[in-house]
Amino acid sequence: MVRISKQAGNGMTRRGLLQGAAVGGVGIAGASLLPAPTASAVGASNGFVFPGVDVVIDGSHATTDVTLLVREYLARKSEADPDGTMTFFSRNPVTYIDAVLGWSWYDWDSLRTALGQFMPNWPKEGKSYPTRILGNSTGAMVFFTDTAGLFGSSEIRAVGVINFSDRRITRQIDYWDGRHFGISDTAKLRVPTDKFPADFRESTVGETAAQTMKNVSYKLARALRNGDGAGAADLFAPGAVFEDVPAHVQIVGPRSIGSYLTGTASLLPYSGQGTAVRHIVGSATGGGYEWTAADGSASRGVIALELDSWGKITRLTAMWDGSQADDSMLVSLSQKAIER
């Protein structure tokens, strides 16, 4: 079964809502009907909602503590409060990189200075809010949206790979689709190629992901590197969903997923011999890995994974910079999703 989707991975499905309600321990579905809380009430027992935004955070594959921590962090960011936002970051080590634009900060003071320059210019109603969180308090994949006006005329729907130590962020790398933001707007903001960071500082935080997440990530990455769609399909649960955000493709079921991965082995930027795992985060049920590619349309990106209790993939979301790919490649990726 194949569905061509809009910006996948940032909505709240009925399945995810019900799962989140079961995991969260509080009445999430009921909480979504409550008036939006003020930012000062963000830590209250009001379910996984977000102040000022009509959204229910999908925390079905995250621990409650990291969901609340991320919500508090982004609520403070949404208040355009540089000092408050920086209380969520470690003094040392700290790394923050935008993997699309190449903007980078490697110490607390420089990041604080940057926020102090950005935030006063944000629109009053601007928000940076989470929609889905995968992982635990050591590391998580955070799907979040920066509304229009924060960093340009369009919204940014990103996946942040975040490492934590003692409830402080030690490393955050943001991946998003430059086509959704606008190809020309993205190009204007991107640093020159010779200035783009080569080291994403994963060595400063180490590999703390759960062993199950590591095992699945490495097996999947190896199958994709070898163009082994059938081997990759074996890692998926019967009702699994595969979604590639820049390609606007969603596929359901291992057989169809395997067929698609076989047919696109030479097209997908995270498939082929030049690909490698950069860093893994998450728990035994939610997380994923950053990847790099020596060749192809995009040189870096992220694979977010939801796993069931047997370690099978129930949902895979791929995020990379589609502005680096030409139209014909994206058309080919869509055509390969047509089943026969």
Language-model region placement:
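Short, solvent-exposed loop/helix junctions and linker helices
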Residues: G11, S60-T64, W105, A210, ...
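A beta-strand edge to alpha-helix "cap/lid" segment located at domain peripheries
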Residues: S45-I57, G116-Q211, A265-Q273, R278-R340
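N-terminal leader/capping segments at the start of a protein or of a new domain
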Residues: L18, G27, S32, N46-F50
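N-terminal export leaders
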Residues: R14-A21
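A solvent-exposed, acidic/Ser-Thr-rich amphipathic alpha-helical stretch
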Residues: L68, E79-G139, G229-A284
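Short, low-complexity N-terminal intrinsically disordered segments enriched in polar/charged residues
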Residues: A22, A41-D83, T87, G182-A230, ...
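N-terminal secretory signal peptides
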Residues: M1-M12, G24-A31, T38-S40
